[in-house]
Amino acid sequence: MSNDSSDNQIRRRHHPVLPKGSFQKKDDSIVLEQELSTPKQVNQARPKFPSPITPTLPEMHLPVGNSKFQAVLPSLISPTLPPGFGMASDDSEASLAENDLHPLDNDSTRTSKTLKNSSEVLTASKLTDEGNSKPLLEEGEVAVSSPILLDSKDVIMGVTKSSKNLVEDAHKSKKASTNSSINNMVSTVNSENSNVNNGSSLNGNTSSNLKRKANVTLGDYKRLKVKNKNPSSQELITADVDKTSGSLSEKSEVNHASLKKTYMRLLNSGKMQKKECDKKGKFFEAYAVDAVLCYTVAFHLQNLSNLSRNHPATTSNWRTLPAYIQFLIKEEDKLDPCIQGLFFLLLGIAFREIFHIEVMRIRHSQLNLMRDIKESSSGLTSAKSLGDAQNLCENAVRLYSSYKHYITSMKKGSSLLTIEYISSTAPNTFNEFFVQKKANIPLPLDIDAPIGVTIRFSHNLLNEWIKKQGDVFESKLLKEDIENLQSLEESYPIAQYL
């Protein structure tokens, strides 16, 4: 018996099984739970985030063409909220300008506009010559008691002040309109008043169904007040609109065919310079820097072309640069500090553009989730909502990774390309960008400097460094390409889309 019990203990100790009904004791269950639990090393393992170079998320499939969802979904590069998330206040000047530019053509709006201009003319025209305070009503006519404000200082909810003020207002309105328009407005009001019950009084002490209900908003009052206060306000608004439309038309006149040719030419130039770098000549690293410069300008031109056509940006091209640059700088001891600094500077540009595009995507996914949460009462149950939530989480991981690499690369490049080193190695470049630079152009080593400024600085520094080394080098990147890039950056700054 003793041997059997010992065998059972050994078997139970080395081969744990689930407890049966007869062994459901408190101590035994605790021991068995500890033996069958997951090891602590598995729980403490860190999750493996995706690499910042290789994309792990498929591209989002947005509706193409004239879809019914096109008006609801916000643009990938537009930070504005869709129309369902908020309403513009009537006090804002933007809403006033929009109402002036896009009037409605329905009957109720036309009626309210004629009432605003003709009510004071009709009231003033029926005053007596002796200056009586009460207007004279002809037979068969009924006074309209509507809450239309002729002026905030003269009339409050249909109750007039004095006949003198009304006469002055009538003279002002007569100067602003012709006699034919006044007759048309008066006839319009008389025809509309004929439909009102004859039992209504002047002060409006009648039933609610007999009162005239005008379709007037606060924006109409404010437009009338601004027009009376400043007659040239409408001209100023139209001038601003013409200026804005002119700038939009200039922005839309981008020669996309020429940009495509430049893009293809720079890609071929980058491939040629990469082949020269692979030959491992005397200054092979200079060809590698020129190849990266050609690729960077080509990819940024493609980005700006997409922004000008309101197309979504892509990171597929930008993600190929970090792997190539990191392959070139893996042996940092054999490279000159100038070449190392330029490599890290261009690496920071690539990660910064990836960061900007991920910001646009994460904002787009956030707006989609906000819309789904607002529309659905049972929560995020659809497959599209769950997909947007997954995209949001994965974009957040890639956003943090690209930002970390972007900051690290820019700091590394700035530490290598110091002011003392640039002034001693390339004095002409130093005088152009640090001594005689314009006030509105940022420094090329700034963490948020435009790509055009950084590319021009890198191109000049590379050519001057090659000349100092006594070597003959022909760059495939033209100055016209850099100037074209800078002009497009001024028209479409990336900051306005973030």
UniProtKB/Swiss-Prot annotation:
Spans traversing the lipid bilayer: none
Biased composition (Basic and acidic residues): 99-110
UniProt cross-references to Pfam families, sorted A to Z: Ebp1_C
Compositionally biased residues, Polar residues: 35-44, 111-126
Superkingdom of source: Eukaryota
GO biological process: transcription elongation by RNA polymerase II
Chain intervals for the UniProt region annotation (Disordered): 1-48, 99-134, 190-209
One GO CC annotation: super elongation complex
Protein name: Uncharacterized protein C6G9.15c
A Gene Ontology molecular function term of the record: transcription elongation factor activity
Entry-linked InterPro entries: Ebp1_C
